From Swiss-Prot:
<comment type="function">
    <text>May act as a repressor of nr2c2-mediated transactivation by suppressing the binding between nr2c2 and its response element in target genes.</text>
</comment>
<comment type="similarity">
    <text>Belongs to the NR2C2AP family.</text>
</comment>
<protein>
    <recommendedName>
        <fullName>Nuclear receptor 2C2-associated protein</fullName>
    </recommendedName>
</protein>
<dbReference type="InterPro" id="IPR008979">
    <property type="entry name" value="Galactose-bd-like_sf"/>
</dbReference>
<keyword id="KW-0539">Nucleus</keyword>
<dbReference type="GO" id="GO:0005634">
    <property type="term" value="C:nucleus"/>
</dbReference>
Amino acid sequence: MAESLICNSTQSRVSSVLNRDVKQFGKKFMFDSNEETCWNSDQGESQWVLLEFPQHVKVSEVRLQFQGGFSGKSCKLEGSSKDENLRHILNFYPEDNNSLQSFPIPDAPLVQKLKIVFENSTDFFGRIIVYTLDILGEKDL
């Protein structure tokens, strides 16, 4: 049964934060279940979110909620074990809207690190705004 793999021990990093204002637009806001807070990247292409889980996980689904006009157009998912180089898992193409979107991952390998790369954005300046990010799957016990 798939469950959220994001927990207090999950470490996250992002490519940038708008104006370095982490108090208002920091990465933690993707995981706080508050529909009024968000991570807002600075401008530039290839923005990303990197997650490191406390143990190996089998990812079955990625859920993202963008702000319309600031969505990823072409995205890729990469993953690896803790000390390995990231490997390509999947390309996906979100719609430019405010809805929670779901991207199933068929035959996902066991990973401990997961990177979502927003290769380009619907925003002219390349900014990405994410209100919700959740990773579903199973923990490798």
